[in-house]
Amino acid sequence: MGMFVNPDNSAFQVALNSEIYVDKSGLIKYTNKVLNTLQGYICNSRPRRFGKSVTANMLTAYYSRGCNSEAMFADLEISKSTDFKKHLNQYDVIHLDIQWCMEPAGGSEQVVPYISERTIAELKEYYPDALPVETKSLPEALSQINALTGKKFIIIIDEWDVLIRDEASNAKAQEDYINFLRGMFKGTEPTKYIQLAYLTGILPIKKEKTQSALNNFDEFTMLSPSRLAPYIGFTEEEVKSLAEEYDQDFEEVKRWYDGYLLRDHQVYNPRAVVSVMLRGEYKSYWSETASYDTVVPLINMNYDGLKTAIIEMLSGSEVKVNTATFKNDTINIKSKDDVLTYMIHLGYLGYNQKLKTAFVPNEEIRQELTTAVESKPWNELLKFQQDSENLLDSTLDMDGVAVAVQIEKIHNEYASSIQYNNENSLSSVLTIAYLSVMQYYFKPIRELPTGRGFADFVFIPKPEYKSDYPALIVELKWNQNVRTAVQQIKDKKYPSSILSYSGDILLVGINYDKSTKEHQCLIERYEKD
C-alpha cells in the first residue's frame, strides 16, 4: 500500500461516512465490463462539484489490492453484480491526483518527473527484480514489469487536465505532460500493461489539429455523456428521494439546481443538492467552490455575437452552439462558440445534445452568471438592463403603449439580428426584453400546459416577491390583434393552471404587425371568480 501504487480505501470511506452519500457504484458494472478491452480507456469529464474525486476514490477502493473493501461495498449497488467479488481488490492500481502533485513537485514543469520518480520507487517495493536502477520512465517501468510478470495495471488519474487549464501559457509543461500521457496510454505497448485507464477532469482530452491527443480514449463529457449519464451528478429520482427524506420542496430544489440535460437524464449538481438538504437554504452554493476568475474573462471576450448570446441565455432562451471547433484547451479559444463550449464544460451552461443549443441551466447558475457579468459590466449591458427595467415597470403599470414602444426599441438596439418572420422570432425578442424580471421571477415557462391550450410565456414570481409582483401570462400574436390575444388567454382558461403559484395575475397580449412594422400591447388584470 503506497501513496500512488495500490492505495488503501480510506478516501472513499470518508464519502461513505458522510450524512448524505448517493450510491454511484453502478458505474463499476461498466468499468468491469470493459476491463482489458479497447473500450477500457475512459475519460470522464464534468464540472467542479460533480463528484469527480469521489468517483476516482470509489474505483480505487474497489480495484486496489492494497486494501480489503468487501464490507465497504456490501450494501452498495455493485455488490448485487455477479462479478462483484471477481474483480474486488484484485488489481495493481496507480492513482494520481495531478492537482495535488503540483505543490510537492515544486511547480508545473516538475509534475511529470515527480510522478515518475515517486511511482517507480513504490513499484520497486512490489517488483524489486523487474526494474533496473536506470529506469526513469514510468511507461517503461510498467512495460518492464509486464514483460517479466505478465501483470497489468489500472491507472486512475484525477484532475487530469489541471495543467491544460491552469498552465495554458506554459508550453513546456503542457508538452511534457501530453507526451507523458501518450507514453502511458498510446500505441501497442500500453495495451500490454493497461487493464483499465480512467481519467477524470473538467475538460475532455486536448485536441491537436482537430484530433484528440489520445484518440484511443472513449470520452464521456457534458456534451456527450452516453451511458455514463446517470453517474454524472444526481439524477431526478435520487433528488426526489433526498427531498422526501429531508422534507424539502422538490419543485423548489428543481428550480434552483436542475437543468443539466445529459442524454435522457435531468441531472442535478451534487454539491448544491447536498448543501440545500443539510442547510435548508435555497441559495447559490456555486461560488463556495468555483471562482469567477475563469468565467469573467471568458464572457468579456470580444467575439461577434457573444454578449448578445449571454444576454439571451440569461433571459431564458437557448442559443445554437457549434461545439466542434473547441480544442479542449484555454489557449486556442477563437470564437463565440469556443467560449460557450468551454462554459458548458465548466458547468456555467447546460447543453441540449439533440438541438445543439446552450442555455443557463437553473436559478443558481443564473445568479452566478449575472454576478459574473456585473462584476465587469459592459456599457451596453448596463443600458440594456435599464431599458429592461423600464419595460417591466411599464408592464406592471399596465401601460400597453409604453410596453410596445420599449419592446420595439429593445428589438432594434439589442436583438436586431433576430429577423421577424413568425411568432417564434417574436418570442425570442421577448425573452431578451424581459431580462430584468429574472431578479423577481423564475425562468419563464414556455408554452405552459393549460386548461384548453398553451400560453406562450408564463412568468411566475419567486416566493419572496409573490405579494409584490403579479404572475404574467403573455400571449404573442403575429399579424393579428392584441384584443384577440388577451381574449384567447381567457378563452383557453390559462389562469387556472397557475392560481396555485401566485395571487395577482396580469394578462399581456402582444402583436406584431408586419405591414406597419409596429408592436401593439394590451394588458388586463385577471379578475378571479
Name each region found by the language model.
Residues 174-180, 478-495:
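Mg2+/Mn2+-dependent nuclease catalytic core
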Residues 154, 470-474, 506:
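Structural motif
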Residues 183-191, 341-349, 431-436, 488-508:
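Metal-dependent nuclease catalytic cores in nucleic-acid-processing enzymes
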Residues 144-149, 438-468:
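Active-site metal-binding core of divalent-cation-utilizing nuclease and nuclease-like domains
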Residues 415-451, 455:
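Catalytic cores of nuclease domains that cleave nucleic-acid phosphodiester backbones
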Residues 430, 455-461, 469-480, 492:
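Conserved catalytic cores of phosphodiester-cleaving nucleases, focusing on short active-site segments
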Residues 1-422, 441, 445:
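Phosphate-binding site recognition
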Residues 497, 503-529:
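Domain-level recognition of nuclease-like catalytic cores that cleave nucleotide substrates
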